[in-house]
């Protein structure tokens, strides 16, 4: 009998909080855009006798994350030392929350491509500190302690995911939720979001989980999905061939698309956790939580409803425009300047997203400002240019930041709306295309629009795209009655 297998997946996500300063001291939390080892002090370097002091902003941001992820926030929690010896840990321990974290029992929900709704539990969120950044050369390694003690929250999911698609969508949803709170850049590219996957397999229907393997070195959401798929296959094959899965930590090898053994997995006892003696218990009052609730930014779900109601967008368009908070902000700025929500939505969903996809960039690196895109839309609104010419102006504006009105005048792209001039062109086309005229007159009501479109196209060709298409259309229909 062939056994069927089921995978069990849990994710641990580390997020850097953009508080401006580190978690235990006043050093700047900037480690990539400045010189090496500039933002350090005796506290974040772990000098003997240097005492940590908890940054209040870290707690506020951590509470925002917990609220956004539907967590229960504990009024009292504490800090613990996780002891281990590694070059990037200057104190030879990490301050974290092991015994009791500040938030627990949360969840997030999302829909898969199939339409199935999935709810993933969040075991807990804990406040901790980052390590120094190791930079590896050919024959040596360097340590940048600018990153040491940058504030982190670790979001630990329940082992509720059953395949790589669910894990991928969990990460996407988590990223969007946190981005809306503006507490973190949530970027794997810059390291402000890091993810480890815990993966095991069991016989389908079993209530006993298999041996868990942790996979690290995952540098994109797609890498997470690929590593999960590989590891599930590896574990099933190993068991079916009579072997057993060892509890271990493995690294994802992106080049070869496999996981490799890094070390045997440590148990909690290996880290000799004990309460942090240099910090008081973390006390969060209900009043503090309520104050932060009032300061919470609009959620994506609330924004979708507002976009539908205020801008008359359908569900699909509102969903796409709110997928990234920066894109939704860009859309609202374009609407503010153009006063035309429908055209703004259409241009962003087609032309802007086309460029973002082609260049593989996000809206923050898009070269046309919201004000300039709005000006292009207003030129269409005022019939100064046609939609076709607007696309030409758009392409020019990608590399030219000047006012679109200046570009239109300089390139001679102003739309022709002089009826007498357009009429001459219409007459010329009708005189030279008798077959199309006859075809239009003999066509049934279903074919007439297609034939008309062809005649309009001929007029637009003569005018080099400048003739007002509405006037062209009206004149042709009048003459072909």
From Swiss-Prot:
InterPro entries membership: Asn/Gln-tRNA_amidoTrfase_suB/E, Asn/Gln-tRNA_Trfase_suB/E_cat, Asn/Gln_amidotransferase, Asn/Gln_tRNA_amidoTrase-B-like, GatB, GatB_C_1, GatB_Yqey_C_2, Gln-tRNA_amidoTrfase_suB_CS
Annotated EC: 6.3.5.-
A biological process term (GO) from this entry: glutaminyl-tRNAGln biosynthesis via transamidation
Keywords: ATP-binding, Ligase, Nucleotide-binding, Protein biosynthesis
PROSITE patterns linked: GATB (PS01234)
Molecular function, one GO term: glutaminyl-tRNA synthase (glutamine-hydrolyzing) activity
Top EC group: ligase
Keyword RNA-binding appears in the UniProt entry: no
Keyword DNA damage belongs to the record: no
Reactions that this protein is recorded to catalyse: L-glutamyl-tRNA(Gln) + L-glutamine + ATP + H2O = L-glutaminyl-tRNA(Gln) + L-glutamate + ADP + phosphate + H(+); L-aspartyl-tRNA(Asn) + L-glutamine + ATP + H2O = L-asparaginyl-tRNA(Asn) + L-glutamate + ADP + phosphate + 2 H(+)
Pfam families: GatB_N, GatB_Yqey
Domain of life from the UniProt record: Bacteria
Family annotation (Gene3D superfamilies): 1.10.10.410, GatB domain, N-terminal subdomain (1.10.150.380)
Record's subunit section: Heterotrimer of A, B and C subunits.
Family: Belongs to the GatB/GatE family. GatB subfamily.
PANTHER family: GLUTAMYL-TRNA GLN AMIDOTRANSFERASE SUBUNIT B MITOCHONDRIAL AND PROKARYOTIC PET112-RELATED (PTHR11659), GLUTAMYL-TRNA(GLN) AMIDOTRANSFERASE SUBUNIT B, MITOCHONDRIAL (PTHR11659:SF0)
Described purpose of this protein according to its UniProt entry: Allows the formation of correctly charged Asn-tRNA(Asn) or Gln-tRNA(Gln) through the transamidation of misacylated Asp-tRNA(Asn) or Glu-tRNA(Gln) in organisms which lack either or both of asparaginyl-tRNA or glutaminyl-tRNA synthetases. The reaction takes place in the presence of glutamine and ATP through an activated phospho-Asp-tRNA(Asn) or phospho-Glu-tRNA(Gln).
Protein name in UniProt: Aspartyl/glutamyl-tRNA(Asn/Gln) amidotransferase subunit B
Organism: Fusobacterium nucleatum subsp. nucleatum (strain ATCC 25586 / DSM 15643 / BCRC 10681 / CIP 101130 / JCM 8532 / KCTC 2640 / LMG 13131 / VPI 4355)
């Amino acid at each position: 009998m062939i056994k069927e297998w089921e995978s069990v997946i849990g994710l641990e996500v580390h997020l850097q909080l953009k508080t401006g300063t580190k978690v235990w001291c006043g050093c700047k939390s900037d480690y990539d855009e400045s010189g090496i080892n500039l933002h350090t002090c005796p506290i974040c370097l772990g000098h003997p006798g240097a005492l940590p002091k908890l940054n209040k902003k870290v707690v506020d941001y951590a509470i925002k994350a917990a609220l956004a992820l539907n967590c229960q926030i504990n009024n009292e929690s504490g800090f613990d030392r996780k002891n281990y010896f590694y070059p990037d840990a200057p104190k030879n321990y990490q301050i974290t929350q092991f015994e009791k974290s500040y938030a627990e029992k949360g969840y997030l929900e999302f829909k898969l491509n199939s339409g199935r709704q999935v709810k993933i539990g969040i075991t807990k969120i804990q406040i901790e500190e980052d390590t120094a950044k190791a930079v590896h050369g050919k024959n040596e390694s360097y340590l940048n302690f600018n990153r040491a003690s940058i504030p982190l929250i670790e979001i630990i999911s329940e082992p509720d995911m059953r395949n790589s698609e669910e894990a991928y969508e969990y990460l996407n949803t988590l990223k969007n939720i946190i981005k809306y709170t503006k507490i973190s850049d949530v970027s794997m590219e810059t390291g402000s979001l890091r993810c480890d996957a815990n993966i095991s397999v069991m016989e389908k229907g079993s209530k006993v989980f298999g041996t868990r393997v942790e996979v690290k070195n995952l540098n994109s959401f797609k890498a997470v999905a690929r590593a999960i798929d590989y590891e599930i296959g590896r574990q099933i094959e190993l068991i079916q061939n009579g072997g057993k899965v060892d509890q271990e930590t493995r690294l994802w090898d992106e080049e070869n698309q496999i996981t490799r053994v890094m070390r045997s997995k440590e148990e909690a006892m290996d880290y000799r956790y004990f309460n942090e003696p240099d910090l008081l218990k973390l006390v969060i009052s209900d009043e503090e939580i309520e104050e932060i609730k009032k300061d919470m930014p609009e959620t994506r779900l609330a924004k979708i409803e507002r976009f539908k109601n205020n801008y008359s967008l359908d569900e699909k368009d509102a969903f796409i425009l709110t997928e990234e908070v920066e894109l939704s902000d860009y859309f609202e700025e374009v609407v503010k300047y153009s006063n035309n929500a429908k055209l703004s939505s259409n241009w962003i969903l087609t032309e802007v997203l086309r460029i973002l996809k082609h260049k593989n960039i996000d809206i923050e690196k898009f070269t046309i400002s919201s004000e300039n895109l709005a000006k292009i839309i207003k030129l269409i609104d005022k019939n100064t240019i046609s939609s076709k010419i607007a696309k030409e102006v758009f392409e020019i504006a990608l590399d030219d930041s000047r006012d679109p009105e200046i570009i239109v005048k300089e390139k001679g792209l102003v739309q022709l709306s002089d009826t007498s001039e357009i009429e001459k062109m219409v007459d010329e086309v009708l005189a030279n295309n008798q077959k199309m005229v006859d075809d239009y007159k003999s066509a049934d009501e279903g074919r007439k629009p297609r034939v008309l479109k062809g005649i309009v196209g001929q007029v637009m060709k003569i005018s080099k795209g400048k003739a007002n298409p509405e006037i062209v259309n009206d004149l042709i229909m009048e003459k072909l009655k």
